[in-house]
């Protein structure tokens, strides 16, 4: 595995972790909070983004305007059943969600969730490192690399991992600061 391939794979892991971070509530409304909601639509689970336009008219409100009015009740039910704890308000054309301010206890829960997502991201990065080092060792065993070249490659893999873990830690610190900001 080349260094560019390894970096690309690690970049994807960091981006996946960032997408997970985006689903965690902060003190203000954000349409990405609803990214993981699937709606039963004509018998199939469909992502909410595919069924409606999501917007945030102000810092405390998320507005959902379905493309098909017949999906309104299903969307409302999916939001109410989600673990987000939102109560949707349906006016017959648009669903509005008032995002209440977070309690201190809820903020701490979300910080723990962010830490869990970051740890999952680190595990994915470490797995990529392990795979890359295994390939380098195999190449050394096959005679493609000398012992010194193998050690240099392994050091390069470790430095790449360290860089991406530091980036992940920075994203986690930013997200925690965002969650804890009142």
Swiss-Prot record:
| One function term, GO molecular function aspect | ribosomal large subunit binding
InterPro entries recorded for this chain? Answer: Ribosome_recyc_fac, Ribosome_recyc_fac_dom, RRF_sf
Give the main localization category: cytoplasm
Q: Which GO terms describe its biological process?
A: translational termination
**Entry's Gene Ontology cellular component terms:** cytoplasm
Please provide the record's keywords in A-Z order.
Cytoplasm, Protein biosynthesis
Q: Key word Electron transport present in the record?
A: no
- CDD domains reported for this sequence: RRF (cd00520)
* Location(s) in or outside the cell: Cytoplasm
**Superkingdom of the source species:** Bacteria
**Task performed by this protein:** Responsible for the release of ribosomes from messenger RNA at the termination of protein biosynthesis. May increase the efficiency of translation by recycling ribosomes from one round of translation to another.
HAMAP family per the UniProt record, alphabetical: RRF (MF_00040)
Q: Which family does it belong to?
A: Belongs to the RRF family.
Kindly provide the name given to this protein in its UniProt entry.
Ribosome-recycling factor
Q: Which organism is it from?
A: Parasynechococcus marenigrum (strain WH8102)
| Taxonomic path | Bacteria, Bacillati, Cyanobacteriota, Cyanophyceae, Synechococcales
């Amino acid at each position: 595995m080349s260094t560019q391939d390894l970096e690309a794979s690690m970049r994807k892991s960091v981006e996946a972790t960032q997408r997970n971070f985006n689903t965690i509530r902060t003190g203000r409304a954000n349409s990405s909070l609803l990214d993981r909601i699937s709606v039963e639509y004509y018998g199939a689970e469909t992502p909410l983004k595919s069924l409606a336009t999501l917007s945030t008219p102000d810092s405390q409100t998320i507005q959902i305007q379905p493309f098909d009015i017949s999906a309104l009740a299903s969307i409302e039910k999916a939001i109410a059943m989600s673990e987000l704890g939102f109560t949707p308000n349906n006016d017959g054309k648009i669903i509005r969600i008032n995002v209440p301010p977070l309690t201190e206890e809820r903020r701490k829960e979300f910080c723990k969730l962010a830490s869990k997502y970051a740890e999952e991201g680190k595990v994915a990065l470490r797995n990529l490192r392990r795979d890359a080092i295994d390939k380098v060792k195999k190449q050394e065993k096959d005679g493609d690399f000398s012992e010194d070249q193998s050690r240099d490659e392994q050091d390069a893999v470790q430095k790449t991992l360290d860089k991406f873990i530091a980036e992940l830690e920075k994203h986690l610190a930013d997200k925690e600061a965002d969650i804890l900001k009142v």
